[in-house]
Amino acid sequence: MTTIVSVRRNNQVVIAGDGQVSLGNTVMKGNARKVRRLYHGKVLAGFAGGTADAFTLFERFEAKLEMHQGHLMRAAVELAKDWRTDRMLRKLEALLAVADAESSLIITGNGDVVQPENDLIAIGSGGNFAQAAATALLENTDLGALEIAEKSLTIAGDICVFTNQFKTIEELSY
C-alpha cells in the first residue's frame, strides 16, 4: 500500500505521499506520484490503495469538481454516492485524501466522506505511524504544515515496509 498524510496549519495545507508501489511482498516501483493538484491547482489529492483504481477515482473526482465548480465537499459527496452505487466503482479499492483552502476530507470506498479532527489526515499502510508523528509535532512544535507532513512521512517510511522515502509533496497557501 502506501502512506498519505495531510496537514493544515497557518493558512497552509499540505498533502504528501511516498512513492512505493508493491505487488504482494515485492516492490514494483519506488517513485510513483500518488499526490496531485486538481481543479486548476486549487485542490490537492492523494491516494492509498490500488494504483489503477486510484487513477480511475482521480478522473471521476476531477470530473465532479468541474461539475460543481470546484466545491470540494459537494464533489466529494457526489463521488462517494457514485462509488456506493456504481457496480464498477464498488470494486475499486482505494482511499482518497483531498483538501482545498477550506476543507480536508477522506473519501472511502464505502462511500463515506469524513472531515477529520484537527484537519489531519493519514491514510494507507503507514497511516497510523504518520498520524501519531504528525499529531505529536502539531501539539508540541511550531513547525509549519510542510515540515510536519514531511517529517511524519519520513517516520512512517522508517517503520512501515510498504512505505518508502521517496516523497511527493504538494502545498496550497491561502
From Swiss-Prot:
SUPFAM superfamilies: N-terminal nucleophile aminohydrolases (Ntn hydrolases) (SSF56235). GO terms for molecular function: metal ion binding; threonine-type endopeptidase activity. Its main location: cytoplasm. One of its GO terms (cellular component) is HslUV protease complex. It is found in: Cytoplasm. Gene3D superfamilies: Glutamine Phosphoribosylpyrophosphate, subunit 1, domain 1. It is an enzyme of class 3 (hydrolase). It catalyses: ATP-dependent cleavage of peptide bonds with broad specificity. Allosterically activated by HslU binding. The keyword Protease applies. Its EC number is 3.4.25.2. Na(+) binds at G157, C160, T163. A double ring-shaped homohexamer of HslV is capped on each side by a ring-shaped HslU homohexamer. The assembly of the HslU/HslV complex is dependent on binding of ATP. This is ATP-dependent protease subunit HslV. It comes from Shewanella amazonensis (strain ATCC BAA-1098 / SB2B).
